[in-house]
From Swiss-Prot:
Protein name as annotated: Cell division protein FtsA
Originating gene: ftsA
Pfam families associated with the record: FtsA, SHS2_FTSA
Family: Belongs to the FtsA/MreB family.
Chief subcellular location: membrane
Membrane topology per record: Peripheral membrane protein
GO CC annotation: cell division site; cytoplasmic side of plasma membrane; cytosol; divisome complex; plasma membrane
Length: 420
């Protein structure tokens, strides 16, 4: 058995309200992620992204990790962990520093980003991510990479994502109870955007919505930069609950009916299609028209998507007032387990009045039969995030080695000049 650290392996772990998913990916030389292990099990002990039964969560995590290890034939020691919940919040901040030399160095960039993130965040919150949006040097704005440019003062605009300390501690505790280390906590909506969006979509303006069981995670990009993140604490489980109450069926059966026979647009359902609905209390099952089922599902999905639309409209108005690109020319990308229902893209187009697609994970090879579903978007995004961290880490080591060799040569040259 190979240890996950012996090869360029990254492990993504998503502990959602509906499922726990673990993916093992190998980083290939061309930057692709080759998925070699998958583990998944229904989630217990989670509600809307928060832990409400630690022992149950630990058991679920252990089961998913065991499956992934068995399939990948490796020993997992650490994971990139997704985090969601209504305690996640965001803010856009600005930092400014004088440029130390004539040209901007990497150190200047790090300093200005550090200045931008050194702001007061909400009480009992910690910073999860600091994501640069763009830079300005003196009077030149909209710079993507300032290194090497000349100027006197540099400004950075950044997007901060924060989370509640205790919520983060609880989910990390569940993972550590399984003998695993958390490499990094990543906002689930950000991970999903790494997984399903293209560079063109980010540039044109796009909103990705990951619809899970307990939460909808939103990330909005315009001009290639992340402008807004949000968690709405209502999602697929609300639809399941509606089905259970409307037809008097157990929640587990309601979930199965939603997944197998659900449709978010009644007009595309055939009139003679029927569904068998289990009853409670030992009563015999009943037959139900699929059209009737769609009449319960469609209004609830429309309501959920309207919550997202309200968020987008408020953001666009704010960006417009700030003079920032606010059009979402690439439309909406829906992903996550609850985005797999039939008719959702057409239902969403009626709400958003723009193009909508269902997003599945991109740029992966290997066990794609398992992982190339919207269901795994967050977990695949964690692998992409981990891959970037791996590559950046290696680049930093190379940079430090080059710098130390360079300084050694400089010292040698100055000594030679002094001596001879």
């Amino acid at each position: 058995m190979i240890k996950a650290t012996d090869r360029k392996l990254v492990v993504g772990l998503e502990i959602g309200t509906a499922k726990v998913a673990a993916l093992v990916g190998e980083v290939l030389p061309d930057g692709m992620v080759n998925i070699i292990g998958v583990g998944s099990c229904p989630s217990r002990g989670m509600d809307k992204g928060g832990v409400n039964d630690l022992e149950s969560v630990v058991k679920c995590v252990q089961r998913a990790i065991d499956q992934a290890e068995l399939m990948a034939d490796c020993q997992i020691s650490s994971v990139y962990l997704a985090l969601s919940g209504k305690h996640i919040s965001c803010q856009n901040e600005i930092g400014m520093v004088p440029i130390s030399e004539e040209e901007v160095t990497q150190e200047d960039v790090e300093n200005v980003v550090h200045t931008a993130k050194s702001v007061r965040v909400r009480d009992e919150h910690r910073v999860l991510h600091v994501i640069p949006q763009e830079y300005a040097i003196d009077y030149q704005e909209g710079i993507k990479n300032p290194v090497g440019l000349s100027g006197v003062r540099m400004q950075a605009k950044v997007h901060l994502i924060t989370c509640h300390n205790d919520m983060a501690k609880n989910i990390v505790k569940a993972v550590e109870r399984c003998g695993l280390k958390v490499d990094q906590l990543i906002f689930a909506g950000l991970a999903s955007s790494y997984s399903v969006l293209t560079e063109d979509e980010r540039e044109l303006g796009v909103c990705v919505v990951d619809i899970g069981g307990g939460t909808m995670d939103i990330a909005v990009y315009t001009g290639g930069a992340l402008r807004h993140t949000k968690v709405i604490p209502y999602a697929g489980n609300v639809v399941t609950s509606d089905i259970a109450y409307a037809f008097g069926t157990p929640p587990s059966d309601a979930e199965a009916i939603k997944v197998r026979h659900g449709c978010a647009l009644g007009s595309i359902v055939g009139k003679d299609e029927s569904v068998e609905v289990p009853s409670v209390g030992g009563r015999p099952p009943r037959s139900l028209q699929r059209q009737t089922l769609a009449e319960v599902i469609e209004p609830r999905y429309t309501e959920l998507l309207n919550l997202v639309n309200e968020e987008i409209l408020q953001l666009q108005e704010k960006l417009r007032q700030q003079g920032v690109k606010h059009h979402l020319a690439a439309g909406i990308v829906l992903t996550g387990g609850a985005a797999q229902i039939e008719g959702l893209a057409a239902c969403a187009q009626r709400v958003f009045h723009t193009q909508v697609r269902i997003g599945a994970p991109l740029n992966i090879t290997g066990l794609t039969d398992y992982a190339q579903e919207p269901y795994y978007s967050t977990a695949v995004g964690l692998l992409h995030y981990g891959k970037e961290s791996h590559l950046n880490g290696e680049a930093e080591v190379e940079k430090r080695v080059t710098a130390s060799v360079g300084s050694w040569i400089k010292r040698l040259n100055s000594w030679l000049r002094k001596e001879f």
